[in-house]
Amino acid sequence: METWQEVTVHVHRDAQEAVSHVLIETGSQGVAIADSADYIGQKDRFGELYPDVEQSDMIAITAYYPSSTNLADVIATINEQLAELASFGLQVGQVTVDSQELAEEDWADNWKKYYEPARITHNLTIVPSWTDYDASAGEKVIKLDPGMAFGTGTHPTTKMSLFALEQVLRGGETVIDVGTGSGVLSIASSLLGAKTIYAYDLDDVAVRVAQENIDLNQGTDNIHVAAGDLLKGVSQEADVIVANILADILVLLTDDAYRLVKKEGYLILSGIISEKLDMVLEAAFSAGFFLETHMVQGEWNALVFKKTDDISGVIGG
């Protein structure tokens, strides 16, 4: 019987998506994220509130590697990457890394215990692909397989992106999703009525994972996924462009975004740690955008910009 190696990284929740990406890049065959915040105020599948749990800023990200993997090399790489993330200003907390061997049948189902349906916005609920879920009237369900996902949709940056999409989409729009990762923002855009969505990611693994998640959801044939370096080479105009990536990368796409966003269209930028906020604002204002909405959750910020000549109620430009 084949055995697997389990590596658990205890890290600040602000680093969830970045660390999940690192684990996939080092060869993990799946990741699971245990975050007490996911259960605060949530109900289980039987409609009962979860019992009170101690809230902490630290989460546990568990990755699974084949037995043939040199775990010492993997852990060394993980520690190097975590140090690099910290140098970019990302809060990683007091990191600890644990490991153990796991039988194959345990690996196949062990990580699933971490996931329950999560209501993210008024209309949007993220549901693990293996869970039977009865949606209420008006509730829109996004099915995800978090086993290979770049986050599960519960990170503050993703939540704020989903809130922003819910606010600006009215139906019939063209949306561009830059750095699509798990594809969750593209799927949400489709469910919220967008006509056509173009999803790009530089990472081939993300492109594949996004397509797999899109295929789990009905009515998402209007999402087109492709490898791409931000908005380079893109000529398709859009009513909405959304990007949930690191601030240092966001500032590189604002000029191209202004070129592609239609008049009266929106640019949604998330993944911005507070100390990088001014840098992103300056880049967007320099490109010609006006700020319409600023959302904050903890140390994270999301910004909704508009391309408009009517500057009443907006800032910057």
Curated annotation (Swiss-Prot):
**Keywords noted in UniProt:** Cytoplasm, Methyltransferase, S-adenosyl-L-methionine, Transferase
Residues in coiled coil = none
Q: Which reaction does it catalyse?
A: L-lysyl-[protein] + 3 S-adenosyl-L-methionine = N(6),N(6),N(6)-trimethyl-L-lysyl-[protein] + 3 S-adenosyl-L-homocysteine + 3 H(+)
InterPro entries linked to this entry: Ribosomal_L11_MeTrfase_PrmA, Ribosomal_PrmA_MeTrfase, SAM-dependent_MTases_sf
Q: Which CDD domains match?
A: AdoMet_MTases (cd02440)
Which of this chain's residues are annotated to bind S-adenosyl-L-methionine? 158, 179, 201, 244
| EC code | 2.1.1.-
* Any one Gene Ontology BP term: methylation
User: By what name is this protein known?
Assistant: Ribosomal protein L11 methyltransferase
- What organism does the UniProt record list as the source? Streptococcus pyogenes serotype M2 (strain MGAS10270)
What lineage, starting at the top, does this entry show? Bacteria, Bacillati, Bacillota, Bacilli, Lactobacillales
